[in-house]
């Protein structure tokens, strides 16, 4: 890894089976954090973009950085969590146009992260908060999408039993100004939604 002022960690966070219980596998976050710790210098910013459980930025990534370097967060270096919000196939447009939420360790980290992301997010807004809020926000966004996909598919099953056209039901229900039911499909999938921690 080459030295830089800012390091962005964006690695998979799959599930692992542990005694019939699904748990998030943070080994990639841990490995990337250890790699960054080998080149981390005073004044650097480390950003975690992976979808992770709340408190991962502080308890996992930062704990490794402090242990491996002997440096202290907010004194020697800064951390942030800025979850990615892009759709495969539309990445460049969405990087530029989508709002970004950045959870930071302090005001200095917020200033540094906002300065960086402002060069990328040219048509969206940037919102600064703490890292736990940013981590939770990403999970809430994905859960909301999961639930909406599930509702559409459950409606398809119900309408099939009632021998009525689900697309007609959804089209008419969506005439309500606060209703936006999705079209039924194959269910939740892809590289992100199906494996949220």
Regions picked out by a protein language model, each given a short descriptive name:
Residues 1-197:
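Structural/interface elements that position substrates and couple domains in central-metabolism enzymes
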């Amino acid at each position: 890894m080459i030295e830089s002022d800012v390091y962005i960690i964006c690695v998979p966070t799959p599930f692992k089976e542990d005694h019939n219980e699904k748990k998030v596998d943070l080994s990639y976050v841990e490995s990337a954090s250890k790699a960054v710790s080998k080149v981390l210098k005073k004044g650097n910013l480390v950003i975690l973009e992976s979808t992770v459980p709340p408190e991962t930025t502080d308890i996992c990534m930062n704990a490794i950085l402090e242990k491996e370097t002997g440096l202290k967060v907010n004194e020697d270096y800064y951390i942030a969590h800025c979850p990615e919000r892009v759709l495969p196939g539309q990445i460049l447009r969405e990087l530029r146009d989508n709002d970004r939420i950045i959870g930071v360790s302090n005001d200095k980290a917020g200033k540094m992260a906002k300065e960086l992301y402002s060069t990328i997010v040219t048509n969206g807004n940037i919102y600064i908060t703490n890292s736990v809020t940013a981590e939770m926000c990403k999970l809430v966004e994905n859960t909301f999408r999961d639930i909406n996909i599930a509702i559409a598919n459950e409606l398809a099953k119900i309408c099939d039993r009632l021998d009525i056209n689900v697309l007609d039901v959804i089209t008419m229900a969506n005439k309500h100004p606060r209703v936006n039911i999705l079209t039924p499909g194959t269910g939740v999938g892809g590289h992100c939604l199906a494996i949220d921690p």
